[in-house]
């Protein structure tokens, strides 16, 4: 697994489902020869109802400059099931697990 963790990232409380999503995302990064950088877990300041606090969201570092980001986001979405949301933010990729229906 080619994964690096930014210093200060808090892993305590991350749910198994988001860890599975992280593993799938790492595979997508690795297929391009890139290392996935985990930039945020359960720490930091987020919106009040953020899934980071529940351990159901993480932030990923962006791929190298020059990458077609919309295509890469679609690649991540395709690799993950519909219970995951992948959102391109200004300086990271937000990955969250959220059950859509029961």
Named regions from a protein language model:
Residues 4, 8-12, 37, 45-102:
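Catalytic cores and adjacent binding grooves of peptidoglycan-active enzymes
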Residues 16-49:
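Extended, low-complexity, intrinsically disordered C-terminal regulatory tails
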């Amino acid at each position: 697994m080619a994964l690096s963790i930014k210093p200060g990232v808090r892993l305590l409380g991350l749910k198994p489902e988001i860890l599975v999503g992280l593993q799938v995302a790492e595979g997508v990064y690795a297929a391009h020869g890139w290392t996935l950088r985990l930039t945020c877990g359960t720490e930091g300041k987020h919106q009040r109802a953020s899934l980071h606090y529940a351990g159901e969201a993480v932030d990923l570092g962006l791929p190298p400059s020059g990458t077609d980001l919309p295509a890469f986001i679609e690649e991540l979405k395709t690799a993950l099931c519909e219970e995951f949301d992948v959102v391109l933010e200004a300086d990271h990729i937000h990955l969250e697990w959220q059950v859509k229906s029961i």
